[in-house]
């Protein structure tokens, strides 16, 4: 599948890499097909690119790189909708917000994207657990982020 994106230009995505979301991302419910785009295998930041709208993409990161003890409770309804039979098939991503001041880099730990990596199905869940902040300060807590290394988030073709 080929798609024209505002950040990466024309990209080609294999059908086997398409992740389907029944409800989309909160506020972007019309986008149902996504793909994870890697800038560099060493860079922890990825792009969650909509394949329905080339202008819609989110910077995401594995929450375990930010909080090694991140343990969100996923309810049975979520596991059933995503057809998760094996816990090893679950991948979690959280959306990163980048404001005009890069020092204000935050991650939403309260609403992770839950992915069934085996079946390429996903949904965003809103957790009721207040231990997980909506605006987790990445730079303030960077000692957890791959040993404190800094990485650039750029919109160059993967």
UniProtKB/Swiss-Prot annotation:
Location of this chain's protein in the cell: Cytoplasm
Keywords of the record: Bacterial flagellum biogenesis, Chaperone, Cytoplasm, Translation regulation
Protein's GO biological process: bacterial-type flagellum assembly; regulation of translation
InterPro entries: Flagellar_assembly_factor_FliW (IPR003775), Flagellar_assmbl_FliW_dom_sf (IPR024046)
Keyword match Cytoplasm: yes
UniProt keyword annotation of Metal-binding present: no
One GO CC term, this protein: cytoplasm
Function: Acts as an anti-CsrA protein, binds CsrA and prevents it from repressing translation of its target genes, one of which is flagellin. Binds to flagellin and participates in the assembly of the flagellum.
HAMAP family associated with the record: FliW
Family indicated by similarity: Belongs to the FliW family.
Subunit structure: Interacts with translational regulator CsrA and flagellin(s).
UniProt xrefs under NCBIfam families: PRK13285.1-1 (NF009793)
Name under which the protein is recorded: Flagellar assembly factor FliW
Lineage: Bacteria, Pseudomonadati, Thermodesulfobacteriota, Syntrophia, Syntrophales
């Amino acid at each position: 599948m080929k798609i024209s994106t505002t950040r990466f230009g024309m990209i080609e995505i294999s059908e086997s890499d398409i992740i389907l979301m029944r409800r989309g991302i909160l506020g972007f419910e019309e986008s149902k097909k996504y793909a994870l785009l890697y800038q560099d295998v060493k860079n922890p930041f990825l792009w969650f690119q909509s394949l329905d709208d080339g202008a819609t993409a989110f910077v995401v990161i594995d929450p375990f790189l930010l909080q090694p003890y991140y343990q969100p409770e996923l309810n049975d309804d979520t596991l059933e909708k995503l057809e998760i039979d094996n816990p090893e098939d679950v991948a979690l991503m959280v959306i990163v917000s980048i404001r005009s001041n890069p020092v204000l880099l935050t991650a939403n730990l309260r609403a992770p994207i839950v992915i069934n990596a085996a079946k390429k199905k996903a949904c965003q869940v809103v957790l009721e657990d207040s231990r997980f902040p909506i605006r987790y300060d990445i730079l303030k807590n960077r000692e957890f982020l791959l040993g404190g290394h800094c990485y650039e988030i750029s919109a160059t073709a993967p």
